[in-house]
Structures are given as structure tokens and as C-alpha cells.
Amino acid sequence: MKPSVILYKSLPDDLLARLESHFNVTRVPDLSPETIEAHASAFSEAQGLLGSSEKVDAALLEKMPALRAASTVSVGYDNFDVDALSAKKIALMHTPTVLTETVADTLMTLVLTTARRALEVAERVKAGEWTGSIGPDWFGCDVHHKTLGIVGMGRIGLALAQRAHFGFNMPILYNARRHHSEAEERFNARYCDLDTLLAESDFVCVILPLTDETHHMIGAEQFRKMKKSAIFINAGRGPVVDENALIAALQSGEIHAAGLDVFEQEPLSKDSPLLTMKNVVALPHIGSATHETRYNMAACAVDNLINALNGDVSQNCVNPKAVK
């Protein structure tokens, strides 16, 4: 008899068929209490869980006593209670490799769009303001040969460094938990402490997961240490940055501009001051949002669940030591 799994995300037809060839699949719209109550038997019997964005905590796990593996269609997993999963020896699988290049593209897009004020001036053209030769009020700033500071030199940081170094001749500074020999050898990246990176970088790009240690890691003190001409980029996790401190730094001219794909509250509140600032590019968390990459992420998540329920957590497992 095939194991039972709960699917709380839409999948392409071919991936759904692959999942159903291995498991008895119960499809649900979400993980709300109402949904769990309506499908109580399926939740109690499910050995697998697959989806994204929903909160998976100890209370949910109490409703799923047979659960052996959860697979998220994402690289981030801050919506999962990893300790609670590990305590019950439930494997948590994620998709860290398939979105690297696409998220790095998004980061480079934010760098370029913010520096050259591309969205702002495009809207001015559409509004009919382009009536002759443009003056300095249309100008942005150069990207090439400017110093890029990367906070968090993981897979995505390395892919961003490659684009910046080879594509734009940008010197690379980075701060991470340890030295990254590949970044130093391939891109001549220089490891430095965070304060030095903030003081010397023209672009500060934060690519960090959300943990207790990284929550509000970038705040008022850090913005004060940046150049007034600095452009701040965040495409990691919103709460890594104290958003009120960022708003204050932008309003006061402490930093020049910001390009943001993530926020403390998502979707971004309609009354957020960030939405009225011309020196802010705000994207709706599109880091991995291309047709190709989202398909590959879903395929990876399906394969991860199949592997985990077959006892293989050698790849893409957040908590392998807890389940062995």
C-alpha cells in the first residue's frame, strides 16, 4: 500500500502525476484549522507533507502523528518549527540549489534598477515628461567598478559575485561565518568584518536566512556606518533588516537608495512609507519567480519527498542528524 501524503500547493500536471505514482495524495487548499478539521483522517494518517508558505509548527504536528517527512517548495524554511520536527524525527526537505542563478539575477536586477533609477524614469516617460534632452534630475549612478559588499556568501552570494566581478568589474567585499576560498580565488573577493564592509561598499547586498542571530542584524547602527551614497539591497529575508531603521535612513539621506525584494511584513502594507519613496525599488518577493525555476523547485520538492520517505535524506535535508 502506498504511503499517504498531504499536498497543500498546486503542482503542474506531470509533477502531480509523479507524486501520485508514489503516494496516495490528499490535496488541500491550506493548513488552516478548518482545513485540518475537514480532512482530519487524512492528516492523521499522512506520512508526508508537501507545499510552501504555510506555518508548520508543533500544534500541526500533533494532528499528524504519522508524519515522517515535510518537503517545502522553497529554500527558506523559517515558517517551519525545525526543533519540533527534529524532536519527532521528521525530515524537513527544501530546494536550495535549483533557484541560485535566478535569485542572483534578481539581485543584479535590483542593483541596476536602483542605481540607474530605471523604474522611476520609465514612469516619467509614460507620463509624458520626456519633452527634450534629459538633465541631471534624470541621471542615476554607475554600477561598473563600484564596490559590492555581500553579507552572506552562500550559493546565491557566490553567483552574485560572479555577475558583479566578470560583468561589471566590481571589487567584491564579503562578510560570512567563514572564509570562502572559491570567492577569493575566482573573484578576488576580500573577507572583512561587517563594519568594514558597510563603510567601504557602494552597494550593500544582504543575502541571509532568518534566524535568531540574524533578526534585525541590519539596523540604525549599521545604516549609520554606510556611505551616504550607498545603495542597500535585500533579497534574503525581510526581518533580517529593521525596516523602521531603513525607512529612517532613507528619509534622512543617511543612505542613498534601496532595492528590496523582501519585507518584514509580506505583502507590504499599502501605507508603508517605502511605497512613496522615489529612491526605493520594491518588488513583491520575486527572487525565484520565473516559470522555469518555479517548475524546477516544485520538481525538486517532489523528488525530495520521494527520497525522504524512502529513507534517503542525503541531499536537501535541513535536519539530517535528527532523523538518522
From Swiss-Prot:
* Entry keyword Cytoplasm: yes
Protein's cellular compartments: Cytoplasm
User: Which of UniProt's keywords are assigned here?
Assistant: Cytoplasm, NAD, NADP, Oxidoreductase
Provide the disulphide bond pattern: none
The catalytic activity, as recorded, is: glycolate + NADP(+) = glyoxylate + NADPH + H(+); (R)-glycerate + NAD(+) = 3-hydroxypyruvate + NADH + H(+); (R)-glycerate + NADP(+) = 3-hydroxypyruvate + NADPH + H(+)
Q: Which GO terms describe its cellular component?
A: cytosol; plasma membrane
Catalytic residue positions: R237, E266, H285 (proton donor)
Task: Decide whether keyword NAD is in the record.
Answer: yes
GO terms for MF:
glyoxylate reductase (NADPH) activity; hydroxypyruvate reductase (NADH) activity; hydroxypyruvate reductase (NADPH) activity; NAD binding
Q: What domain of life?
A: Bacteria
EC number from the UniProt entry: 1.1.1.79, 1.1.1.81
Q: What does this protein do?
A: Catalyzes the NADPH-dependent reduction of glyoxylate and hydroxypyruvate into glycolate and glycerate, respectively.
What is the protein's quaternary organization?
Homodimer.
Q: Which family does it belong to?
A: Belongs to the D-isomer specific 2-hydroxyacid dehydrogenase family. GhrB subfamily.
Name the record gives this protein: Glyoxylate/hydroxypyruvate reductase B
Q: Which species expresses this protein natively?
A: Cronobacter sakazakii (strain ATCC BAA-894) (Enterobacter sakazakii)
Q: What is the lineage of its organism?
A: Bacteria, Pseudomonadati, Pseudomonadota, Gammaproteobacteria, Enterobacterales
Q: Gene name on record?
A: ghrB
